[in-house]
Amino acid sequence: MTDATSGSDPDSTTPVDLTGEDFRDPDALRRRAGVSGDPNFDQHFLIDDRVLDRIPTYLLDSTDTTHILEIGAGTGALTDRLLAVGDTVTVIERDATLAAFLREEFAVMIDDGRLNIIEGDALEVTLPAFTTCISNLPYGISSEILFELLPADCPLIVMVQREFGERMAADPGTDAYGRLSVSAQHYATVEVVETVPPTAFAPEPAVDSALIRAEPRDPDYTVTDETFFLRFVKAVFTQRRKTVRNAIRNTAHISMLDTPDAVVNAADEALLSQRAGDLTPSEFAELATIAAEKGK
């Protein structure tokens, strides 16, 4: 769980080197596609060549790039870079016009079997098997998509709203730490590797963006019922200003506990006296295990 570094040095994390590669110009791609973007549909095209070139360099040396998944390919500016580092790339694009453009623009790569185009909404189509996902995600559905991707146990490098990314990576005891932090860090070690200004996009979004890297991890705890664990975390954080003791009692209707008092009686006082924002994912897992055994 590492905090943001604006424009951090990619060479410190990976040997990926795109020097000398001749990539398609993002502005030229937009002109050929005949699109300008639509903020009402979360359509902001990443047009800064420097940012686009850096994105693949945040891959760790150990990352398997056999099959890269990209969600929201747009005009293909990032797709072009991903084809330089991946054996096969599959993109999901919901805009029919853009999907048709991608099939024409990258026809050679498609014919060579290196690029697959899936036309549809990423939340509705069946996600293909992949070894890593690198995407500029539609911000309005970032959370839903990420919690489809994180359980796949594959590395992710994704662009999200800066505030959202910082919440994912936040440490216990900080203002940004919350349900999103615990849930994301249950699956992965999350790091904000770069912050990106609105000027890197066209049209410009109203907020800063952030690139996050999520590396799958094996938790130092065991959760027997993952669905209940995530629901319990959600419930307790709805009363983050209360002590955990009171939060468990007051949110039994959310966590679906029948006997919350039994949970409180069985739990460690050192945990019950804290607030949700101070508990680590491991401590939440300890409480959730007790809740599942004593409260249901």
From Swiss-Prot:
It comes from Haloquadratum walsbyi (strain DSM 16790 / HBSQ001). Belongs to the class I-like SAM-binding methyltransferase superfamily. rRNA adenine N(6)-methyltransferase family. RsmA subfamily. Keywords: Cytoplasm, Methyltransferase, RNA-binding, rRNA processing, S-adenosyl-L-methionine, Transferase. Residues 1-25 are annotated as: Disordered. It is found in: Cytoplasm. This is Probable ribosomal RNA small subunit methyltransferase A. CDD domains: AdoMet_MTases. The gene is rsmA. It comes from the Archaea. Residues 1-16 have a biased composition (Polar residues).
